[in-house]
Every structure is written in structure tokens, then in C-alpha cells.
């Protein structure tokens, strides 16, 4: 009496031993081993390569935009400069850019409106934050801001819509700014710090694309100039070369891994496993 064909159902009682291996699986594995010994001729399309480079650049630009939060905070908290002039200048630039764009007016208006609501709400709550922060040690503030920063970068990098920040990333940004603003001395400093961070990380990214050549140049000049002043030119050069390595070399390594290893590792699962659930 012939046995029924083996099925890939672990919960089904079958007339096969527990260590049974299907012959088709063995043939597939042998064929893949033979192919792995040959020179790989798989290639990625130019569009796929360009998308990989763009993803690396987008993440790098996200790091730059996030670093503006700490640059602004250091400008106000450590150096004690007046935050009103840069706030007015940045607000003027934001207003000009928003008027020159041809995006739907209603959507842009809603983005600005929601950001302003958050700003004035935080301005109202800033005295409360100041009173609460008196009982909080600075080490706790720095630790909390560090983890909020990592969380913010992770969320905004994994957002599918790159032209509009998600609600979660906006809330994390507001929480991060609220934590840092508790160290500032006056309500005006808190308001200006919050307004600058919201414009740089919420409003302006909705208008400016990462492919814009002017924005990355200005961002890099500001960030590396600040690093030169704050850390010195040696550390600035180390960070600069690490950034160049990340933008130029790592994408090539990732493309090489994508061509030679990634598909090969997933061939077995994608071919053998069912694409849709198999029911009894």
C-alpha cells in the first residue's frame, strides 16, 4: 500500500518519521549549492542602486536635521546667546519657502497650523515644565534625551512617507524638545528653542526634498562648523571622514552584499515555504 504524499503541515499526523526529509528539498538544496560555486551574474538595476544610495543619504540627512536640535540647545544653554534673532530669521525663511512651493495649500496650511498649535501649547506649559524640572537631575535629562533621540531617528527613518513626518515622530520630537527645554532659564528661550526645532524638523522637511542640492550643503556647513567650534578640528575631521565613508563606501558594500549574498540566503525560504497559509 503506497503512502500518501508528504505535506508540509507539522501538526498533521503522517506516515513518515519525524526526521523525514522530502526528496524535492534535497534536490533544491543541491542545486543551490552548485549555483553558489559559480560566479554570480545577478545585477541590480540602476534604479535600485540609486534608491539604495538615496536611502543612505536620507538617513544621513535625518542625522543632520536631528543634530540641529542639540546645536540650537547648545547655542542657547551653553553659550548663552540670544535666540530671538535666529528664530525670526528662520521663521522668515520658512514663510518664503512655504509661499514659493506649489503643493496643495490646504495640506501645507494644516501642517503649519498643527505645528503652531503644538508650539503655543508648549509655550503655555513651559512654566509647568520649569517647575517639574527643578526636581530632576541633569544626568537624567541627558539620558532621557539620548534615548528619545535614538527613538526619533528610528521612527522617522522607518516612515514610508518621507515628505510628511508621522504623528509618532512629531510627538517624540516634542517630547525630546520638552525634556531639553527644561534646562533653559527663561520662557522666551523655551519658546524660541521649540519654534526653531519644529521649523527645522517638521515644517521645512515638508517643503524641501532630500534631493535638493542646496539643503545638504547648507546643513553640512552649519553642522561641521559647529563641530569645529565645539569639539575642535581634529574631532570634526574624524566625524567628517566617517560621514564620507558612510555615504560613499557603505552603499557600494551594501549593493555588493545585496547582489552576492542576500538573494542567495533567501532563495531557500522563498522557494520552499508556502507564500499563502496551507490549511487542512
Curated annotation (Swiss-Prot):
The record gives the membrane topology as: Multi-pass membrane protein
- Please name the top-level EC class of this enzyme: transferase
Give its localization. Membrane
Q: Which terms under GO biological process does the entry name?
A: fungal-type cell wall organization; GPI anchor biosynthetic process
Cytoplasmic-side stretches of the chain, per the record, are 1-53, 97-108, 157-189, 242-280
Q: What is its main location?
A: membrane
Pathway the protein takes part in: Glycolipid biosynthesis; glycosylphosphatidylinositol-anchor biosynthesis
The record's GO CC annotations read: endoplasmic reticulum; endoplasmic reticulum membrane; glycosylphosphatidylinositol-N-acetylglucosaminyltransferase (GPI-GnT) complex
EC numbers on record: 2.4.1.198
Keywords in alphabetical order, please.
Glycosyltransferase, GPI-anchor biosynthesis, Membrane, Transferase, Transmembrane, Transmembrane helix
What's its catalytic activity? a 1,2-diacyl-sn-glycero-3-phospho-(1D-myo-inositol) + UDP-N-acetyl-alpha-D-glucosamine = a 6-(N-acetyl-alpha-D-glucosaminyl)-1-(1,2-diacyl-sn-glycero-3-phospho)-1D-myo-inositol + UDP + H(+)
The transmembrane residues are: 54-74, 76-96, 109-129, 136-156, 190-210, 221-241
A single GO molecular-function term is: phosphatidylinositol N-acetylglucosaminyltransferase activity
* Extracellular-side segments: 75, 130-135, 211-220
**Record-linked PANTHER family:** PHOSPHATIDYLINOSITOL GLYCAN, CLASS C, PHOSPHATIDYLINOSITOL N-ACETYLGLUCOSAMINYLTRANSFERASE SUBUNIT C
Q: What does this protein do?
A: Part of the complex catalyzing the transfer of N-acetylglucosamine from UDP-N-acetylglucosamine to phosphatidylinositol, the first step of GPI biosynthesis.
**What family is reported?**
Belongs to the PIGC family.
Q: How does it assemble?
A: Component of the phosphatidylinositol N-acetylglucosaminyltransferase (GPI-GlcNAc transferase) complex composed of at least GPI1, GPI2, GPI3, GPI15, GPI19 and ERI1. Interacts with ERI1.
Kindly provide the name given to this protein in its UniProt entry. Phosphatidylinositol N-acetylglucosaminyltransferase GPI2 subunit
- Organism (species): Saccharomyces cerevisiae (strain ATCC 204508 / S288c)
